[in-house]
């Protein structure tokens, strides 16, 4: 369980990185001294409720690694990640709590959607994983989401390659 912080309020940061570092061991170098790749070096930032954060930079600068830190998919080598004032640990329960509230939206919908899953399954999967609502409520939520982005109900039964790029973006 993450460390408790009972003083968190909705005005405080939802996600906070403090001096986050991620270092990967490379396959080059020797067995006892592998080369290291510094993917993220001393990143500190906060995101408050209702804010949207875009990470922009050149290829290989650490955007994806920083995003993975923020949504709990990557643990920092050093530094700390906080969610609603609680320090995130390395347990799956910590990541699940974060995953219910925070997500990444990828720029390219071709890579964001599983090409083997129909739109319905893509949309309902996170609701199933997090146990949100009853099965009937989940189905209603999926239909509501589709309506919200202006897609017809028939779009639920198609694979991503069967809809236009703009429609894929709206699904993603």
Predicted feature locations:
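Conserved ABC ATPase "signature" region
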Residues: 137-154
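Q-loop/switch helix immediately C-terminal to the Walker
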Residues: 108, 117-128
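ABC ATPase NBD coupling module
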Residues: 29-34, 87-103, 121, 129, ...
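Conserved ABC ATPase signature
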Residues: 159-163, 167
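ATP-binding/catalytic-site motifs of ATP-hydrolyzing domains
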Residues: 80-82, 86
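The feature captures the beta-strand-to-loop junction immediately N-terminal to the Walker
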Residues: 56-57
